[in-house]
Amino acid sequence: MKIDLNADLGEGCASDAELLTLVSSANIACGFHAGDAQTMQACVREAIKNGVAIGAHPSFPDRENFGRSAMQLPPETVYAQTLYQIGALATIARAQGGVMRHVKPHGMLYNQTAKEAQLADAIARAVYACDPALVLVGLAGSELIRAGKQYGLTTREEVFADRGYQADGSLVPRSQPGALIENEEQALAQTLEMVQHGRVKSITGEWATVTAQTVCLHGDGEHALAFARRLRSTFAEKEIVVAA
């Protein structure tokens, strides 16, 4: 069994360099919610050094709230903003001898494209326009995954080690109780259940079906690195290979 392990980087966390030794894919902030040209260059350089797949992490234009504010923008605006961000990272990667492999939206853009078909279409269209060979990463079973498949893109369905799930397979909003799993044992058990058995227990107790092709690790938690190391160790014990 194989699984991709990804992390969002270039967002101001001190653990970026160490996380890049543990993950197989890096989603690099492109300036709209965090990061800038220099952090993008630095993250690309470290990803290449560690053999980690380079990906863009585009966002709504919302540095004030770290890309977590809901926005109702025209799809054409979202298309242009996404193309701008992923195009910048693709060029930075190419300039350093690397290749951008995937795109994963950030924050509220990620959440809204999971449910809003027009927004999902705008993202998928931008990714296709940039490079049809790019992999589009989105929430398992989401509108974004459906849109990517409609454009003929390779898609990668994502699950979260430390997020609570609702009965329909969507994430519990961060503003609600149960959104974040802070117990390491619970997060580890949830991850293995999703990867090995394709299901997750919702906060209301029902099982939701999920397709786990990549697992997101958040690097901003207090015990993020320790959990990442433990997850890698557990995967090795279960003969689950970590690779992009």
UniProtKB/Swiss-Prot annotation:
The keyword Membrane does not apply. Pfam families: LamB_YcsF. One of its GO terms (molecular function) is ATP binding. It catalyses: 5-oxo-L-proline + ATP + 2 H2O = L-glutamate + ADP + phosphate + H(+). Its EC number is 3.5.2.9. GO terms for biological process: carbohydrate metabolic process. Keywords: ATP-binding, Hydrolase, Nucleotide-binding. Signal peptide: none annotated. Forms a complex composed of PxpA, PxpB and PxpC. PANTHER family: 5-OXOPROLINASE SUBUNIT A, UNCHARACTERIZED PROTEIN YBGL-RELATED. Belongs to the LamB/PxpA family. Catalyzes the cleavage of 5-oxoproline to form L-glutamate coupled to the hydrolysis of ATP to ADP and inorganic phosphate. This is 5-oxoprolinase subunit A. It comes from Shigella boydii serotype 18 (strain CDC 3083-94 / BS512). The lineage of its organism: Bacteria, Pseudomonadati, Pseudomonadota, Gammaproteobacteria, Enterobacterales.
